[in-house]
Curated annotation (Swiss-Prot):
The lineage of its organism: Eukaryota, Metazoa, Chordata, Craniata, Vertebrata. The gene is gpn3. Small GTPase required for proper localization of RNA polymerase II (RNAPII). May act at an RNAP assembly step prior to nuclear import. The keyword Transit peptide does not apply. This is GPN-loop GTPase 3. CDD domains: GPN3 (cd17872). Heterodimer with gpn1. Binds to RNA polymerase II (RNAPII). GTP binds at residues 13-18, 174-177. Belongs to the GPN-loop GTPase family.
Amino acid sequence: MPRYAQLVMGPAGSGKSTYCATMLEHCQALNRSVQVVNLDPAAEHFEYPVIADIRELIQVDDVMEDDSLRFGPNGGLIFCMEYFSNNFDWLEESLGHVEDDYILFDCPGQIELYTHLPVMKQLVEQLQQWEFRVCGVFLVDSQFMVETFKFISGVMAALSAMVMLEIPQVNIMTKMDLLSPKAKKEIEKYLDPDMYSMMEDNSVALRSKKFSKLTKAICGLIDDYSMVRFLPFDRTDEEGINIVLQHIDFSIQYGEDLEVKEPKEVDEEPSNSNFDAFFQDTADS
């Protein structure tokens, strides 16, 4: 029987630990067995129980205090993750082997781990050898994504992780519950974006012809291949959380021995149908 894993990624402060705590609580309400593993050696606290904690193997503070290494916070974290990649047997022993395992891996926030360093790719390959079906869950803070150029930056980060790890990936805008009604209405266009229209709306801000061409080329790549779209995540909205879980389960074929159904939100114009309920509170604003 296969095992299942969500690799919860994203920049620092994007809400990875909150996502794990919320998803764990939601799955428990559905009587689904889900466990969490902390892979952030710099974590100070989190709101969920774990079956494995990388800090039992190595901690950033210990590395930084080692006079022979002389690492700062970022270098110390990279060292910890490289040490972890050489000690996957610790993770295997911590996980054990139970059929139908469903694990959430709460990962560090250093973006270079998902763009050009091999550590997370090695983790994915190791999990696959242990018969895990792995889905990347890339989080971005919705409060950061309300401007077109910031949105493009977030899309490129998500796309880099997708290309690097070569696994199914679901991209999520977190902290939707913290947005004002006006901001919710504004951000709807970024969930399933028309990149060309967005660029036309912001063409005045592109003063440099060289960078204007580059930005338009990037937007064209994203739009033409439909590579990146986002789902909203509001920790107070059980239906919205379930929609996210459906998409992830579908991508890794969770429970394939049962009748697997495609998530109801997968259709041609999701922005007009998927999120009506979520944004109904903005209709009168």
